[in-house]
């Protein structure tokens, strides 16, 4: 196998999960020589604005995909939730490895349970999806925008006027934070995850047979089926980052895929949700999308997209 160059965002989390994936590859192919090339993306350069207000898809991947096309790197290790549902022609997701915990972590300054936070308590999140679902269940709470990496957000929780923050559990775990700092992990009924949350997507050129063969050795087919249902739903709903959209699939005991799709308004007042089982992930994602459109969810999406 030739020497491989991996493209990664420059953040501590991105570099850590890239190294963890490289270790996984070396476990099946010990003699691999791999180097990481750090790439700064548009999303990394925007630190003073809410990403949903910037607009556009692929804020964290476009520059990395460009490096793949230019053959400056051989593969890219993405957080799958950052990858738009349509992959450019000539590139492919060469593998979906094991998924980390896909749920969100709720961290309270005083370790107060979410259901017991006093009226007017301020929760920090940079995600419309999280904000909408929290306001839907707890309209007496206040959502305040927060940006920055995990360390920055944890520091802001202590030094600014946040009573609690919500972060992806996967990032905390990959960075080695213990469960001690987490007040609770929020289950799917409290906070349905983002599309592909906790999963990685390994992107490479579609014609790189040698690399695709290597990547197949660390591919998790069950996770791939689940995230395919989720990503199909996202593509069918045409959900941009202005739309609170969530979707989560699991494999049932009967070996079927169970998928829940969710569309909301940012204020949490309108909610469209549907769950169903199936065996074909693409069909499942499309069917749930159609069910939500029948309920009126597409009107929300059109309205929110027109506002921006």
Swiss-Prot record:
Pathway membership: Porphyrin-containing compound metabolism; protoporphyrin-IX biosynthesis; coproporphyrinogen-III from 5-aminolevulinate: step 2/4
A matching Pfam family: Porphobil_deam
S-(dipyrrolylmethanemethyl)cysteine PTM sites in chain numbering: 241
Catalytic activity: 4 porphobilinogen + H2O = hydroxymethylbilane + 4 NH4(+)
SUPFAM superfamilies associated with the record: Periplasmic binding protein-like II, Porphobilinogen deaminase (hydroxymethylbilane synthase), C-terminal domain
Required cofactor names: dipyrromethane
Subunit organization: Monomer.
GO CC terms of this entry: cytoplasm
Note: The porphobilinogen subunits are added to the dipyrromethane group.
Gene Ontology biological process: heme biosynthetic process; protoporphyrinogen IX biosynthetic process
EC numbers on record: 2.5.1.61
InterPro entries reported for this sequence: HemC (IPR000860), Porphobilin_deaminase_cofac_BS (IPR022419), Porphobilin_deaminase_N (IPR022417), Porphobilinogen_deaminase_C (IPR022418), Porphobilinogen_deaminase_C_sf (IPR036803)
Membrane-crossing segments per the record: none
Note accompanying the cofactor annotation: Binds 1 dipyrromethane group covalently.
EC primary class: transferase
Protein name: Porphobilinogen deaminase
Record GO terms (molecular function): hydroxymethylbilane synthase activity
Annotated family: Belongs to the HMBS family.
Gene from which this protein is expressed: hemC
UniProt keyword list: Porphyrin biosynthesis, Transferase
Functional description taken from the UniProt entry: Tetrapolymerization of the monopyrrole PBG into the hydroxymethylbilane pre-uroporphyrinogen in several discrete steps.
């Amino acid at each position: 196998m030739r020497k491989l160059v991996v493209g990664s965002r420059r953040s501590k989390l991105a570099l850590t999960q890239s190294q963890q994936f490289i270790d996984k590859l070396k476990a099946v192919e010990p003699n691999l020589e791999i180097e990481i090339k750090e790439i700064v993306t548009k999303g990394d350069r925007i630190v003073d604005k809410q990403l949903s207000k910037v607009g556009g898809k692929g804020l964290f991947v476009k520059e990395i995909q460009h490096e793949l096309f230019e053959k400056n790197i051989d593969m890219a290790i993405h957080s799958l939730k950052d990858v738009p549902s349509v992959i450019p022609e000539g590139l492919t997701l060469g593998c979906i490895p094991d998924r980390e915990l896909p749920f969100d972590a709720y961290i309270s300054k005083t370790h107060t349970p979410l259901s017991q936070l006093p009226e007017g308590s301020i929760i920090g999140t940079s995600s419309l999806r999280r904000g909408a679902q929290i306001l839907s269940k707890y309209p007496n709470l206040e959502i305040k925008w927060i940006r920055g990496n995990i360390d920055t957000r944890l520091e802001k929780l202590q030094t600014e006027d946040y009573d609690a923050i919500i972060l992806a559990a996967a990032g905390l775990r990959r960075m080695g934070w213990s469960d001690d700092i987490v007040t609770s992990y929020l289950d799917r009924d409290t906070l349905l995850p983002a599309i592909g949350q906790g999963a990685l997507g390994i992107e490479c050129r579609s014609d790189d047979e040698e690399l695709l063969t290597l990547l197949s050795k660390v591919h998790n087919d069950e996770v791939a089926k689940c995230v395919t249902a989720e990503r199909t739903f996202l593509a069918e709903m045409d959900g941009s980052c202005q739309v609170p959209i969530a979707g989560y699939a699991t494999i049932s005991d009967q070996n079927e895929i169970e998928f829940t799709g969710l569309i909301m308004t940012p204020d949490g007042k309108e909610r469209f949700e549907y769950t169903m089982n199936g065996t074909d992930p693409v069909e499942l994602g499309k069917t749930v999308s159609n069910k939500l459109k029948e309920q009126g969810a597409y009107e929300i999406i059109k309205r929110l997209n027109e506002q921006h």
